[in-house]
Amino acid sequence: AVEEFAANYGTLIITVDCGIANIAEIEKANELSIDVIVTDHHRPQETLPAAYTIIDPKIKDGDKYIYPFPDLAGCGVAYKLASAIRFALKSAYYGQPVCLLNTRPANGDAWIIETLKLRNLLIIDKLTETIVPGTAGINDTRLGAFFSNQLIFTWDAALQKRTLAKIFGSGIEFNMADLQPEIGAAMPLVAGKSLFRLKEISHAARYAQGAFGELDVFYNLFVSYVQKKEQLLQDEDDFDLQLAAVGTIADLMPLHNENRVIIQAGIEAINRKMHPGLADLVFKLGLAGRKLRSAEISWQICPVINSAGRMGRANVSAQLLLEKDPKERDRLAAEIIAMDNERKDLGARVWTIANPIATQNLEVYSGNLAFAWSDDIPRGATGITANRLSSHFKLPSLVVSFNDGIATGSLRSARGYDLQGILEQCADLFIDWGGHGYAAGFSMDRANWDAFLERLRTAAKTIEFSAPKSDAETIYIDAELPLSYLNPDIFKVIDTFQPYGKDNKELMFLSRGLKVIDIGFIGRLETRHVKLTLDAGRYKWAAVYWNAAEKVDKDFTLNDVVDAVFKIERNWFKGNEIPQICVHDLQRQ
């Protein structure tokens, strides 16, 4: 691919969610005078590729990550690069050093002078001086050098100048620009208020971890003002943000820190004005007209988009998101949904192959690894099958397919095991490998297969879990709800903790004394699932209880009073939103 790109006079390659392990390919690009910018989030190996630039939050300086949030998704890294390029093209502040200055009283007669130095809206330096008026000149402080050749912005310049004159004397002239009038005009809610007052009413100050002062308020206002004034956050950025949110959910990244912010802001953008490609897919999936949340994106949208890649035609999903012509987008959306149906059929067929093999191999791999391989398993089904094996056996799982003499494997973790332990013990056998502690993959020459099996048997003996197997079946309850709390207002609580996903599971409740007033069954060919109506007093709740048909008339029956553990969700039927309980466990009182 690199040679083909060079033959077409390409000069720059930007990777997305890959590249950190592609040392040979990037070396070839260098030989062909092609620059490579790597954007990735996978763990780097000991040797980094010789790329023009590497952007990866998992790169360390010694034992410490350089970037403050190493779990950023690959699509999040790419989104940040796209946003930075857009800022460079549109902003007058690109590359320009700026200082923000504020003064405030300290204890006694002293004053605090605090300042931030910014470049590209990011803090690159900060300085704080505490001075008693008349005890020092400006040349006795570090301020002169800090302010040298800098554009200085302040809030209420007249007040700041009076304070500085009081500290250093009236002979010192500070050349500063007052942003209070401009920001106040752009954001009427802050007009006429001091930084001290704004700090008192700031949500950021209220929920900040650690100190949050007046200068922090000024910095946040400045960034928001520049974004608004220069119209940096328009449809184009919103559409990119939506894709970053969907990608972060699809990649099963932990929902905290920046991932949570990206998903939350991205979902808000989706519900405000959806990306055209997503909108066409959402329409064909029957989701149009409803407010989308993380659950719909995770369960109904992400698998469909991913299906094209599973079926070896990832370019179709990419084209849907790039296509400008509405008719062509409609055709592509229909094609992707057809591939998703094909993927489901393939997954069911491959499961009948992989499950017996993994079961047979359990003892061989010390009961610590679910491992299946077959010439009949297509490469596109390895990931989804490994995921299903992991869930089924509550063990780390590996599924391998073979094609043209190459073994391709997908691994999924369970019970807190870090997959790097297996991969590193076999690394010299691989053509390439990479991933996370909980999802990874590799490719390998089939000639190394016997050596790999031997290594894997040894590695499996060393697997240790951070969570016992029983924990996988334990239900953790977030709150016990009195029956009076089971009303539609409960969604205000549930939505407060959105978005849900990895490391932020949906809220699980316990309620006692519910009466079963109706029982039905779901399914035409099989009646495995149960639908219930539960009486909570003022409100009657529709409920589903999956795989519970055999429990009817055994563990509970009509008119029983029960205690239930459940989630509360929204179900859509014929265009109407219906609150619904999803039962996880139920016991007769």
Language-model segments: what does each one mean?
Residues 175, 183, 202, 398-413:
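Short glycine-cluster motifs
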Residues 50-122, 180-359:
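A structured phosphate/pyrophosphate-recognition subdomain
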Residues 128-188, 215, 221-222:
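Conserved DEDDh/DEDDy metal-dependent 3′-5′ exonuclease domain
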Residues 105-133, 264-303, 307-351, 391, ...:
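Acidic, two-metal ion nucleic-acid-processing modules in DNA metabolism proteins
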Residues 22, 43-47, 61-63, 180-185, ...:
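Short gly/pro/ser/thr-enriched loop/turn and capping motifs at secondary-structure boundaries
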Residues 361-387:
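Flexible, glycine/threonine-enriched loop-and-boundary segments that flank and lead into catalytic domains
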Residues 1-48, 54-56, 60, 130-156, ...:
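N-terminal small/polar loop signature for handling phosphorylated ligands or for N-terminal nucleophile
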